[in-house]
Amino acid sequence: MVSRTTTSIPINFRGVGVYKTFANKNLLYCNCNIVSMEKTDLLMMTFAIVNLADYMTTVKGIEMGFHELNEFVSSLNPASFLLLKIAIVATAFALLLYTRRLSFSLGRGIYIGLVAGLAISTAVLGICSVHNLLLLTGFPEVEFLVKVMTGVLALI
């Protein structure tokens, strides 16, 4: 029977923990434990994707003759609307990066408030994007779903 003595050496770099295990007889055993992405990074990525989906469905809907309810958005051309979406995502990302590093309690409160606001905004914008997508595909029960979603949002 061969006995092995092992040593773990943790190496950490930006959100990833890698543990390399060395054993006797020049054998190398690697156990890579990749820590999952931080929840706020996942939220920011989701926020950016939902904003892109909202942009594409809104522009396509206007091209197909649908009426945009937001008067400000309907006054923009597609290029300026895209710049607005990019500015919104970049500003939210910069604020999250800045407030993430704050250590005092007010800074942490601002950070938590930003995360909560982005989560709510992502959920509502996601619902709007799905609604636009259903309208674009000609889904006949969209108006019923709009009434259901409006009722659910009114309860929240």
UniProtKB/Swiss-Prot annotation:
It comes from the Archaea. One of its GO terms (cellular component) is plasma membrane. The chain crosses the membrane at residues 42-59, 79-98, 105-127. It is a multi-pass membrane protein. Pfam families: DUF5658. The keyword Ion transport does not apply. Keywords: Cell membrane, Membrane, Transmembrane, Transmembrane helix. It is found in: Cell membrane. Coiled coil: none annotated. This is Uncharacterized protein AF_1335.
